[in-house]
Amino acid sequence: MTRIVIAGPRGNMGQEAVKLCLREESFELVAVVDSKNDGKQLKGLQEFQQGDVPVYTDMARCFAEHEPDVLIDLTAPAFGRKHMEVAFEHGVRPVVGTTGFSDEDIRDLTKLAEAKELGAIIAPNFAIGAILMMKFAQTAARYMNDVEIIEQHHDRKLDAPSGTAVKTAQLIAEVRAPKKQGHEQEREEMAGARGADFDGMKIHSVRLPGRVAHQEVLFGGVGQTLSIRHDSLNRESFMPGVKLAVEQVVKLSTLVYGLENLID
């Protein structure tokens, strides 16, 4: 039985993670960490009808009193690194779904994980289909090096481009030499019209109500194009990946960035 604490239970992703932990026989949800509602029970919150699970606002106190195995952090980019550091201090393995980590953050957190001999997972996207999309895009980039990424999310998302888009670009860059795309004399008549630049690739971010999480990787070649697309239609689509991450993190002794590293 894996003892779990969820940070950010009232968010859309957090609510799905709570349902996952309550229905999985091998998971035990021992507490949740929220920005408010300290001392209440989960089932007493507006978003939930069940769950005899205590609510904390102090993560360190929560860990000290319940000694969980795993933290599932689904809060906001501003809190991800701090929550991971608190988890390491208490011997807890973090599974983090927030984005916005810099390369320096990843390096520092990897050192902390290895010093504590604890597993940790940061997942820009938990959807298995999205992970496959990234892996397929990396394979395609070996043969077609003209590529642009279009990602679409709901209009409440704080960061742009998305962590999934950045991770996709990073994977492509591993097999593709930097290349400036478009005409050599190309100019933007409006700033930002061509999107963000990553090694010459362009990343375009769309934010609209009614969207959840969508990404298309577009490749162009002589006389042909290739499109690789993934759509998450609801947040339940992320839960198989969350389950996989929780099951795998207890077997690790370092930080893994991206679920693609856990899928053969």
UniProtKB/Swiss-Prot annotation:
GO molecular function, a single term: oxidoreductase activity, acting on CH or CH2 groups, NAD or NADP as acceptor
A GO cellular-component term linked to this record: cytosol
GO biological process: diaminopimelate biosynthetic process; lysine biosynthetic process via diaminopimelate
Sequence positions that bind NADP(+): 36
The gene coding this protein: dapB
Location in or out of the cell: Cytoplasm
Protein name from the UniProt record: 4-hydroxy-tetrahydrodipicolinate reductase
Origin species: Shouchella clausii (strain KSM-K16) (Alkalihalobacillus clausii)
Job description of the protein: Catalyzes the conversion of 4-hydroxy-tetrahydrodipicolinate (HTPA) to tetrahydrodipicolinate.
